[in-house]
Amino acid sequence: MNNAEILKHVDHTLLKPVATWDDIKKICDESIEYNTASICIPACYISRIHETYGDKINICTVVGFPLGYSSTEGKIAETKQALADGANEIDMVINISDVKNKAYDKVTEEIRALKEVVGNKILKVIIETCYLTEEEKIAMCKAVTEAGADYIKTSTGFGTGGATLEDIKLFKKHIGPNVKIKAAGGVSTVEDLNMFINEGCDRLGTSRAVGLLKGEETQGY
């Protein structure tokens, strides 16, 4: 797979708490130049990006990020504001405590509630695999499928681990046919980019892809 094809699968990501407007502009410009699938950025920058770049960029943002603890009502409010500001894609974090309490139906209902708000736009569900057992991961595959979300996503990039090949294989076995996979966290080499796409990931969340494919040494998410 050539570099251009790889980058069409990349959500060019900048979610560091110290991200400046100059940092954000850099990834916006790179997204336009290299035709990435989207940029994934903090919600506070959505309006400014939309005002500056218009429809040249597909904007993704995060909700309930990175811990997932906020209430469903809070996540709905975040989502509504993000969409009003110009986001086209929402990456939400589930309440991991609900998973640990085996309140799987509650997680499903929260995802469903956000999908109702998102409508025809894209909802990706971050399940933070590094904290879950295999049983819990399978339960979340079912929850994401039943709730009608568009993607299941491995990680925030702020947890104790990121995407693994084993988790991608597990997802493929247990998600429904309409659910796609996004790998994020630890996608740090060109080999990783190719491996996850070849394994069936439709999206990759990383800040490193453009630099890696340009042959640069990079650090980040």
Swiss-Prot record:
It holds the Pfam family DeoC. It is found in: Cytoplasm. Pathway: Carbohydrate degradation; 2-deoxy-D-ribose 1-phosphate degradation; D-glyceraldehyde 3-phosphate and acetaldehyde from 2-deoxy-alpha-D-ribose 1-phosphate: step 2/2. CDD domains: DeoC. It is an enzyme of class 4 (lyase). Signal peptide: none annotated. Its EC number is 4.1.2.4. This is Deoxyribose-phosphate aldolase. It comes from Clostridium botulinum (strain Alaska E43 / Type E3).
